[in-house]
């Protein structure tokens, strides 16, 4: 059972994922679970070409063609804002305000973040979009370059000793950790893993 995990989800977004996968291995020792850390976009691509049996990605509800999606967690979509940003201390940010700003996102594929791309287009906003995959890389780049990064809303988070904070992004559906699998594949082990992750990650 080949599972691709987006680097955007670990270690901060799903901090318990490693422990949960180890529980799965212990509970089902007959299922050989192989995990690979990949970019958000690569997980989708390798599911589509048959390299992976299942994948975990960060998304806003969209799903690439030929894949079936199950949301494991749902949170209010937000932007990670550095202390030097004019958005610091705000309760929300409108998509139109992102015009010309550096915006870090987990991937550039059109489907997973489709609501974001559509909303930016409708608002006439053209941010400088770059891929920011790993959490600590994103933390550094938002502060070093006064950028913003797609995140989930965590009011009580102790992000880097208070140098960044989350501000809600208006007009977005929930940001999710999602389980993906090929649409027409009947793989009982994949269904079992999906159910197991739903059960153990639902309170995150």
Predicted regions and their residues:
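N-terminal winged-helix
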Residues: 1-28, 32-34, 44
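Secondary-structure junction motif
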Residues: 13-17, 101-123
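Short amphipathic alpha-helical coupling segments at ligand-binding clamshell hinges
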Residues: 16, 115-116, 185-197
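Short beta-strand-centered segments that line the small-molecule binding cleft or hinge
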Residues: 19-23, 40-77, 81, 164-166
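Short beta-strand-to-loop elements that line the ligand-binding cleft
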Residues: 31-39, 58, 106, 124-136
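Short helices/loops that flank or line small-molecule/ion binding pockets
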Residues: 36-52, 135-146
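Beta-alpha-beta core module
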Residues: 64-70, 74-75, 136-188, 192
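Flexible hinge/capping segments at coil-to-helix
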Residues: 67-77, 81-103, 187-191
């Amino acid at each position: 059972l080949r599972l691709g995990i987006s680097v955007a989800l670990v270690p901060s977004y799903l901090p318990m994922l490693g422990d949960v996968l180890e529980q799965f291995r212990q509970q089902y020792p007959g299922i050989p679970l192989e995990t690979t850390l990949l970019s958000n976009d690569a997980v989708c691509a390798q599911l589509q070409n048959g390299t992976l049996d299942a994948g975990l990605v960060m998304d806003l509800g969209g799903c690439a063609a030929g894949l079936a999606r199950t949301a494991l967690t749902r949170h209010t979509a937000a932007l990670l804002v550095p202390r030097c940003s004019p958005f610091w201390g705000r309760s929300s940010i409108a998509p139109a305000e992102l015009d010309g700003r550096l915006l870090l996102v987990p991937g550039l594929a059109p489907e997973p973040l489709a609501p974001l791309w559509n909303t930016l287009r409708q608002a006439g906003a053209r941010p400088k979009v770059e891929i920011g995959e790993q959490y600590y890389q994103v933390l550094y780049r938002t502060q070093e370059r006064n950028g913003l990064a797609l995140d989930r809303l965590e009011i009580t988070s102790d992000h880097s000793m208070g140098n960044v904070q989350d501000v809600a992004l208006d007009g977005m559906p929930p940001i999710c950790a999602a389980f993906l699998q090929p649409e027409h594949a009947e793989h009982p082990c994949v269904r079992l893993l999906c159910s197991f992750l739903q059960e153990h990650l639902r309170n995150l």
